[in-house]
C-alpha cells in the first residue's frame, strides 16, 4: 500500500536534528557491505519509506529473511571464486545477472530468458564466477527486469584489486591513477509507485503478467535506496531498517574521493557534483586506458556524469580551492595560519602532494619548485593572504541556512542570530550533489527531495573515519 502525509518539511527538520543528536555516527568514508566469497541472498517482499512519509511495497535481496533496498553490497577480491546462492520467496520466479562479469555459471532452478531462475523457496539457484577484474559492478534481476528492477531487485558488487589494503594501499584498480583517500557509493534509481501498487494487489501469475510497465513514469528517485533528505542520515540508521545505506559525503582539501556510481534502475541519470569537476577514470569495471599498464590515460574531467541503466562509472573528486582568488582560511587578526611559500629556503611547498615526491628544481636556484600547494594543508599558495573580494552584508540583510557557519572562511564560524545555523560542526563548506534532471529532485512532486545528497568540505585536520 502507498501512503503519504507530505510531511517533507517536518522530516527534513528531523533529519538535521538527528545528525546533531549525541551518539549519532558521522558519515564514514568507507563503503559498508558484505565481504567474503560465498553469499546467500534471499529475494523477498517488504516496504521501504520515502522522505515525504510514503510507504512503498518493494521486492529486494537480503542476507536473511528480510529484504533491503538496494540489495547488500557484495565486496570481494580480485581472483576470488565467488558463489552467490539465491533463494526466492517472491510470488514470481526471479534470478540474478552480473553485468560486466565474465564466465558466470548458473546451476539449479529453471531455465529463464537470460539465466537460471528460482521459482520458489525450495528452488535455490547458484551463480559462480571468478572476479577476474577489479572495479565497480552491479547485480540485478535477469527476469523481466522492466518490472523486477523497478520493484527493487538490484545491488552493487565491488571487486578489490590485488594488493589492496584499506590503510596503506587504497586503489580501485591497482594502478596509482585510481588511488583514493575516501570512497563513496552512489546507486541511482527510480520507482513508479503505480507499478508497486499493482504488484501489491496482484495474486495470480496472470495478474503479474498483466502489470503494464510501458507507461513507466517514476515518482521517486533514490541515492542508495533513500530519497532526500533521508540520504543525509548515516548508514545503518535505525529509522531505515530496510534502507541501510546513506550517501552523505565528507572530505578535506586535496582528498581524493572515489565516487562509485551505478545506474541501478531503468532510467539514465545525470549526477552533478557541486564544488569541482571530477575525473572519470573507469567505466563498467574497466580503467579508461589506451592499453595494458597505461593507467587511466583516457580519463576525462566533467561536472556532470550521466550513468546508463546497469552501467557503472568511477570518478575521482578532488577539491583544492585553486584559483579562488582569495585566501579561503581568512586574512588579518584571528585568521593567522602560517605561511605558504614555494621555491625558497624552508618552503612550505616542496613535494607534489598527489605523489608525495619532492618536486624538481626547474629554475636551478637550489630549491624544489613545489606544486603550488601547502604540503600539509593543501592551501593554494598563490592565494595566501589575499583578502575576501567583497564586503559581506550585515546580518539583517541575510537569510541563513542550517549549514552556514556565519563565516566565509574554511574552519571558522562567526556570530549568527539566535536559532540560525548550528548544523556545521567544523566550519566546513557544504555543496549539494544531485541529479541534473530537475524533475528528479522531488518526492511525489514535493520539492526538494529525490536524488540529492550533500558533500561537506571539512577543514584540514578534521578526522574522517
Model segments located where?
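Copper-binding active sites and cupredoxin-like electron-transfer domains
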Residues: 2-6, 26-465
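Bacterial N-terminal signal peptides
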Residues: 10-22
Amino acid at each position: 500500500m502507498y501512503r503519504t502525509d507530505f510531511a517533507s518539511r517536518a522530516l527534513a527538520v528531523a533529519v538535521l536534528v538527528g545528525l546533531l543528536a549525541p551518539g549519532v555516527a558521522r558519515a564514514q568514508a568507507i563503503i559498508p557491505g558484505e565481504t567474503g566469497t560465498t553469499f546467500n541472498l534471499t529475494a523477498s517482499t517488504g516496504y521501504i519509506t520515502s522522505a515525504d512519509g510514503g510507504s512503498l511495497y518493494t521486492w529486494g535481496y537480503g542476507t536473511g529473511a528480510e529484504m533491503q533496498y538496494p540489495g547488500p553490497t557484495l565486496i570481494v577480491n580480485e581472483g576470488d571464486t565467488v558463489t552467490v546462492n539465491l533463494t526466492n520467496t517472491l510470488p514470481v520466479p526471479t534470478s540474478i545477472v552480473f553485468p560486466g562479469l565474465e564466465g558466470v555459471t548458473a546451476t539449479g532452478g529453471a531455465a529463464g530468458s537470460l539465466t537460471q531462475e528460482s521459482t520458489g523457496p525450495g528452488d535455490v539457484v547458484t551463480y559462480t564466477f571468478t572476479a577476474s577484474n577489479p572495479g565497480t559492478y552491479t547485480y540485478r534481476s535477469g527476469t523481466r527486469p522492466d518490472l523486477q528492477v523497478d520493484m527493487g531487485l538490484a545491488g552493487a558488487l565491488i571487486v578489490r584489486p590485488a594488493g589492496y589494503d584499506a590503510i596503506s594501499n587504497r586503489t580501485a584498480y591497482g594502478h596509482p591513477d585510481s588511488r583514493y583517500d575516501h570512497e563513496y557509493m552512489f546507486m541511482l534509481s527510480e520507482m513508479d509507485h503505480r507499478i508497486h501498487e499493482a504488484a501489491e494487489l496482484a495474486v495470480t501469475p496472470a495478474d503479474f503478467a498483466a502489470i503494464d510497465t510501458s507507461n513507466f513514469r517514476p515518482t521517486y528517485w533514490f541515492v542508495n535506496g533513500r530519497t532526500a533528505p533521508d540520504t543525509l542520515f548515516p548508514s545503518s540508521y535505525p529509522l531505515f531498517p530496510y534502507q541501510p545505506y546513506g550517501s552523505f559525503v565528507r572530505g578535506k582539501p586535496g582528498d581524493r574521493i572515489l565516487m562509485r556510481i551505478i545506474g541501478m534502475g531503468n532510467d539514465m541519470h545525470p549526477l552533478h557534483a557541486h564544488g569541482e569537476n571530477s575525473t572519470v577514470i573507469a567505466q563498467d569495471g574497466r580503467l579508461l586506458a589506451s592499453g595494458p599498464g597505461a593507467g587511466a590515460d583516457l580519463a576525462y574531467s566533467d561536472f556532470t556524469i550521466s550513468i546508463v541503466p546497469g552501467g557503472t562509472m568511477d570518478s575521482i573528486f578532488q577539491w583544492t580551492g585553486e584559483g579562488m582568488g582569495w585566501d579561503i582560511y581568512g586574512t588579518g587578526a584571528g585568521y593567522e595560519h602560517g605561511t605558504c611559500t614555494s621555491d625558497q629556503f624552508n618552503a612550505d611547498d616542496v613535494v607534489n602532494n598527489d605523489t608525495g615526491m619532492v618536486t624538481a628544481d626547474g629554475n636551478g636556484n637550489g630549491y624544489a619548485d613545489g606544486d603550488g600547494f601547502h604540503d600539509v594543508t593543501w592551501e593554494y599558495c598563490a592565494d595566501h593572504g589575499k583578502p575576501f573580494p567583497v564586503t559581506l552584508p550585515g546580518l539583517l540583510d541575510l537569510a541563513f541556512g542550517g549549514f552556514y557557519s556565519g563565516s566565509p572562511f574554511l574552519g571558522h564560524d562567526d556570530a549568527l542570530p539566535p536559532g540560525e545555523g548550528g548544523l556545521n560542526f567544523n566550519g566546513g563548506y557544504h555543496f549539494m550533489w544531485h541529479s541534473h534532471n530537475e524533475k528528479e529532485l522531488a518526492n511525489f512532486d514535493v520539492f526538494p527531495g529525490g536524488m540529492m545528497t550533500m558533500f561537506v568540505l571539512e577543514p584540514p585536520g578534521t578526522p574522517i573515519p
